[in-house]
């Protein structure tokens, strides 16, 4: 969502004073895809952390013109495991997968193959 405004070549040496890092928004690739969707299916991803996670993910799905959105939580960051919910355009959770990240990815891919591709 954000990147540093400027890149520093090499290593920044300590100077004994605080460093301020300015961030700028990155391009919204998912929104661009949604605007040019045509007949393609779009699966979006939403990392949400509060009690409104489902609502926020559904809002993102609609704003970005996705067909489904994968909701996951920050607890997955740095973890070997994950739990995701697949939410459709009607706001319904159509699948929940949990396990190792590899297992969850495999389950998600199987869902995509059987639901979208066929």
Label the predicted regions.
Residues 1-76, 85, 94-95:
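Glycine-rich phosphate/dinucleotide-binding loop and adjoining beta-alpha-beta core of small-molecule
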Residues 66, 73-118:
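Small-residue (G/A/S/T)-rich helix-start motifs and N-terminal tracts that mark the onset
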């Amino acid at each position: 969502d954000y990147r540093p405004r400027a890149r520093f070549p090499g290593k920044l040496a300590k100077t004994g004073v605080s460093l301020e890092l300015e961030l700028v928004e990155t391009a919204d690739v998912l929104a661009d895809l949604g605007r040019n969707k045509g007949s393609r299916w779009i699966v979006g991803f939403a990392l949400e952390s509060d009690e409104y996670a489902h609502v926020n993910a559904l809002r993102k799905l609609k704003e970005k013109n996705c067909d489904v959105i994968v909701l996951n939580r920050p607890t997955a960051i740095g973890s070997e495991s994950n739990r995701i919910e697949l939410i459709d355009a009607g706001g319904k959770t159509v699948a929940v997968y949990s396990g190792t990240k590899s297992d969850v990815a495999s389950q998600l891919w199987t869902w995509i193959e059987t639901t979208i591709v066929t």
